[in-house]
């Protein structure tokens, strides 16, 4: 199964594509969609087109996207929601089922700790996918979203279920921290 993860943002939208076979995760691609400094409609169109292109190029079976959190600034929350909507439209237009996860669910599934930092997310994504270098934070979050979705439907959905995959890489989670 191929999963496309999306970390939505108005300026930068991260994406990550992984293949899942049983409990094995394999990196396919990741990166960002950058929007131009332009009016809102142009930026949203760029996100929609970028996501639509990813769906055509990588032919994922499913997609996962982060839910909007309520920010201190209501305007920022509204703009993020619109960017997320443009990304979802690109996914749905490509015929994909779309799952949604909170940031807490994402961090819990990938790191085993709901308050994990960006650097902890990047490190864990790098290790789980055997990457030679760390992806940027937006791409790492998107890859994490795909990993979270892969774990949601089976025993890998809990940190105890992650134990075999971590052990193969010489790692374990102790009190919310990655120990290796």
UniProtKB/Swiss-Prot annotation:
Q: Entry's Gene3D superfamilies? A: Ribonuclease H-like superfamily/Ribonuclease H
Gene Ontology molecular function terms on file: crossover junction DNA endonuclease activity; DNA binding; magnesium ion binding
Keyword terms of this UniProt record: Cytoplasm, DNA damage, DNA recombination, DNA repair, DNA-binding, Endonuclease, Hydrolase, Magnesium, Metal-binding, Nuclease
Record note on cofactor:
Binds 2 Mg(2+) ion per subunit.
Q: What is its EC number?
A: 3.1.21.10
The protein's predominant localisation is: cytoplasm
User: If you read the UniProt record, what top EC class would you report for this enzyme, in one word?
Assistant: hydrolase
One GO term describing the cellular component = cytoplasm
Which GO biological process categories is it annotated with?
A: DNA recombination; DNA repair
Q: Which residues bind Mg(2+) 2?
A: 66
Matching CDD domains: RuvC (cd16962)
**Which cofactors does it use?**
Mg(2+)
Q: What does this protein do?
A: The RuvA-RuvB-RuvC complex processes Holliday junction (HJ) DNA during genetic recombination and DNA repair. Endonuclease that resolves HJ intermediates. Cleaves cruciform DNA by making single-stranded nicks across the HJ at symmetrical positions within the homologous arms, yielding a 5'-phosphate and a 3'-hydroxyl group; requires a central core of homology in the junction. The consensus cleavage sequence is 5'-(A/T)TT(C/G)-3'. Cleavage occurs on the 3'-side of the TT dinucleotide at the point of strand exchange.
Record-stated family: Belongs to the RuvC family.
Summary of subunit composition and partner proteins: Homodimer which binds Holliday junction (HJ) DNA. The HJ becomes 2-fold symmetrical on binding to RuvC with unstacked arms; it has a different conformation from HJ DNA in complex with RuvA. In the full resolvosome a probable DNA-RuvA(4)-RuvB(12)-RuvC(2) complex forms which resolves the HJ.
What name goes with this protein? Crossover junction endodeoxyribonuclease RuvC
- Per the UniProt record, the source organism is Burkholderia vietnamiensis (strain G4 / LMG 22486) (Burkholderia cepacia (strain R1808))
């Amino acid at each position: 199964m191929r999963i496309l993860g999306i970390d939505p943002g108005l300026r930068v939208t991260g994406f990550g594509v992984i293949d899942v076979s049983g409990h094995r995760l394999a990196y396919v691609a990741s990166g960002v969609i950058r929007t131009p400094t332009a009016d809102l409609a142009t930026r949203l169109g760029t996100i929609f087109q970028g996501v639509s292109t990813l769906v055509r190029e990588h032919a994922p079976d499913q997609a996962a996207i982060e839910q909007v959190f309520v920010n201190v600034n209501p305007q920022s929350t509204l703009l993020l929601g619109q960017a997320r909507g443009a990304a979802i439209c690109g996914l749905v237009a490509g015929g994909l089922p779309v799952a949604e996860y909170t940031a807490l669910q994402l961090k819990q599934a990938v790191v085993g700790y709901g308050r994990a930092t960006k650097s902890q997310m990047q490190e864990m994504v790098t290790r789980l996918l055997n990457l030679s270098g760390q992806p940027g934070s937006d791409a790492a979050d998107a890859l994490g979203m795909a990993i979270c979705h892969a774990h949601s439907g089976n025993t890998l959905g809990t940190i105890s279920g992650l134990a075999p995959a971590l052990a193969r890489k010489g790692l374990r989670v102790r009190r919310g921290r990655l120990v290796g």
